[in-house]
């Protein structure tokens, strides 16, 4: 397509028709399983504290708010969906727009479509099985394989990520010619993420989707810490053909612990010169009121459709990428 014809969609019309069919198939998948489709706000007065996520910010200046209200476009519908769960809605899913002020490229667009769903009374493994069912149905792929985070590092880097110190992690990075980055990095989790991205991801999910589970407890985010091994979190990610597709948790339900994690995130943000973010008190109040034991997962629809169609880029499956918006 001509670079000058920016009024035209980035994706072909046949691809958009196939995308619509996949969206309908996903809705049938959940309807058949009795999971309620919901809609939640795209904007909130609070946002994520995660140091790796960068939300878009806007300002409401309507009647009665002459001073204005800061609002953030949602990076995920997670917080609002958990409030619905605490209110007793039962299992829910959502197909929605999410926004992240970060990368743009083959696998990234600042505005993207997210599939997120939550299953009360599911543990992490049961939800992983359901994700696998969905992937097999949409992608017509083989059943997934599963590796713990520890097993993945031991297999591909010959190092134990749960016990290795920073010197050992830097030595592993040197074998990947990453010393220029690793030698000046003091944060252990950043070193682990560097090794995972460069030393593990290229080797997994080539022939079938691969679940990586039991991430280090320091990377728990909104997941519970394992009661069987306090070094790891009940968190998983899914990779297929070089693409990260999904990120799931056995959800943390303790409001006090969640608040402590948010505050710790903001301390890390301050140490890195990043703005501290407003904590979502409504979410904490919902957790305090009683979030049911549940597991949840977020899956990138644009990436899923890209894989299903054998496309080379998100631009091939999105009507208008940000450069044509």
UniProtKB/Swiss-Prot annotation:
S-S bonds: none
Catalytic activity, as annotated: D-beta-lysine + L-lysyl-[protein] + ATP = N(6)-((3R)-3,6-diaminohexanoyl)-L-lysyl-[protein] + AMP + diphosphate + H(+)
A Pfam match: tRNA-synt_2
Binding site for substrate: 76-78, 118, 251
GO molecular function, one term: lysine-tRNA ligase activity
Highest taxon of source: Bacteria
Enzyme Commission designation: 6.3.2.-
One cellular component term from this protein's GO annotations in UniProt: cytosol
Enzyme class name: ligase
Subunit structure comment from the entry: Homodimer.
Protein name: Elongation factor P--(R)-beta-lysine ligase
Organism: Salmonella dublin (strain CT_02021853)
Gene for this chain: epmA
């Amino acid at each position: 397509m001509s670079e000058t014809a920016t009024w035209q969609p980035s994706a072909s019309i046949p691809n958009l028709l196939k995308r619509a069919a996949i969206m309908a198939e996903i809705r049938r998948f959940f309807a058949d399983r009795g999971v309620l489709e919901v809609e939640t706000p795209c904007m909130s007065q609070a946002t994520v504290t995660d140091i790796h996520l960068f939300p878009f910010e806007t300002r409401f200046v309507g009647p009665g708010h002459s001073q204005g209200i800061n609002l953030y476009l949602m990076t995920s519908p997670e917080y609002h969906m958990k409030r619905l769960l605490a209110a007793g809605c039962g299992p829910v899913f959502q197909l929605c727009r999410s926004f992240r002020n970060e990368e743009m490229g083959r696998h990234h667009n600042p505005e993207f479509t997210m599939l997120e769903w939550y299953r009360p009374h599911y543990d992490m493994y049961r939800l992983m099985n359901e994700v696998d069912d969905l992937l097999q149905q949409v992608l017509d792929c083989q059943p997934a394989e599963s590796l713990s985070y520890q097993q993945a590092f031991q297999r591909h880097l010959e190092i134990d990520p749960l016990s290795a110190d920073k010197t050992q992690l830097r030595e592993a990075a040197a074998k990947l010619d990453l010393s220029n980055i690793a030698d000046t990095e003091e944060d252990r989790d950043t070193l682990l993420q560097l090794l995972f991205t460069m030393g593990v991801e290229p080797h997994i999910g080539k022939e079938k989707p691969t679940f990586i589970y039991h991430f280090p407890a320091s990377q728990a985010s909104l997941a519970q810490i394992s009661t069987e091994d306090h070094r790891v979190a009940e968190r998983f990610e899914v990779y297929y053909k070089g693409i990260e597709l999904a990120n799931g948790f056995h959800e943390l339900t303790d409001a006090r612990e969640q608040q402590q994690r948010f505050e710790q995130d903001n301390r890390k943000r301050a140490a890195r010169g990043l703005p501290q973010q407003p904590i979502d008190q409504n979410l904490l109040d919902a957790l305090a009121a009683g979030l049911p034991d549940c597991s949840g997962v977020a899956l990138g629809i644009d990436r899923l459709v890209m894989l299903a169609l054998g496309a080379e880029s998100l631009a091939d499956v999105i009507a208008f990428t940000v450069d044509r918006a």
